From Swiss-Prot:
Lineage: Bacteria, Bacillati, Actinomycetota, Actinomycetes, Kitasatosporales
Predominant cellular place of this UniProt entry's protein: cytoplasm
HAMAP family associated with the record: Urease_beta (MF_01954)
Gene3D superfamilies: Urease, beta subunit
Subunit and partners: Heterotrimer of UreA (gamma), UreB (beta) and UreC (alpha) subunits. Three heterotrimers associate to form the active enzyme.
Assigned EC number: 3.5.1.5
Organism (species): Streptomyces coelicolor (strain ATCC BAA-471 / A3(2) / M145)
Protein name: Urease subunit beta
Entry keywords, A to Z: Cytoplasm, Hydrolase
Compartments in which it is found: Cytoplasm
Family (UniProt): Belongs to the urease beta subunit family.
Length: 103
């Protein structure tokens, strides 16, 4: 491999395969765009986003790691959310959870 070289797979790479997903419609009620990253606890996303936060508890966007979804003002967007994996502990962010998701 050469430094900086990009090697492509012969077949599409599946990610988050087999994870239980829920679909939600999100409306940005703010006056400017809001972006949410791939591994952000979606229930704690910007308060200008209107959606079922209880259904989003313990979940993140079903998108590739390191990417994000941009929500433009006044435009509803359907998203898929999957469970956060690993230890399922959320600290920081907006402070709504502050620990174990399954406690």
């Amino acid at each position: 491999m050469i430094p900086g070289e990009i090697l492509f797979a012969d077949e599409p790479v599946a990610f988050n395969e087999g994870r239980e997903a829920v679909r939600l419609t999100v409306l940005n009620t703010a006056d400017r765009p809001v972006q949410v990253g791939s591994h952000y606890h979606f229930a704690e996303a910007n308060p200008g986003l209107e959606f079922d936060r209880a259904a989003a508890h313990g979940r993140r966007l079903d998108i590739a790691a390191g990417t994000a979804v941009r929500f433009e003002p006044g435009i509803p967007v359907d998203v898929r959310l999957i469970p956060l994996a690993g230890a399922r502990v959320v600290v920081g962010l907006r402070g709504a959870t502050g620990g174990a998701l399954d406690a």
